[in-house]
A protein has these predicted regions:
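Active-site-adjacent structural elements in enzyme catalytic cores
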Residues: 1-186
Length: 186
């Protein structure tokens, strides 16, 4: 796992994109502060760049680095979540502009899964984490379901958990609006 993390960090530091296991499904990732790397992910997924992608980080303590005016309810939601939870915050900062929603919002998930948490810790920046599929196609439940077009389009494929055949599901998503308005998306 350590070698995988080191190689993935080197690739992302150079502006490349990776295929990696997360706390939910396999994801395509890159440096969430690098607009060119984010653009590569949009192109690989054949996804319109007006559709935001989420960010993965290893600690709730880092959220204030990427979110302006952190809503108080967010801390409660993070604390009580018993499954992976992506929260869409209304005002992002210090992230690639092409990663954000048209309204300046950003979805961030704090990962507790060992590999993705250690990857975030080692990289010291937030990661893009978007499903490893072409836009409009089903999300892969495990590595074996990731299409060849995605595998061939990334700069590095993490070896860790490639043999894990258990089916994973995407995270729950909650959107927080100004004034603490909560909307369940998924």
């Amino acid at each position: 796992m350590t070698e995988d993390i080191q190689k993935a960090c080197e690739i992302m530091q150079a502006g490349g994109i990776i295929l990696y296991p997360t706390d939910t499904i396999w994801g395509i990732g890159c440096d969430a502060t690098n607009e060119k790397a984010v653009q590569k992910v949009y192109e690989l997924k054949k996804r319109m760049d007006n559709k935001a992608m989420l960010v993965l980080t290893d600690s709730s303590a880092k959220l204030s680095m990427y979110v302006s005016d952190m809503p108080d309810i967010a801390w409660d939601l993070i604390e009580v979540a018993d499954k992976p939870l992506t929260i869409i915050y209304p005002h992002a900062k210090n992230l690639a502009n092409n990663l954000l929603g048209e309204d300046g919002s950003v979805g961030i998930r704090v990962t507790n899964e060992e590999f993705s948490r250690k990857l975030c810790e080692r990289f010291r920046k937030p990661l893009v984490s978007t499903s490893a599929n072409v836009s409009g196609e089903p999300s892969p439940g495990n590595f074996s379901e990731v299409s060849d077009s995605i595998k061939n389009g990334v700069d590095y494929i993490v070896k860790y958990r490639q043999d894990d055949m258990s089916k994973a599901k995407p995270s729950n998503i909650i959107k927080l609006g100004d004034g603490g308005v909560v909307q369940v998306i998924r």
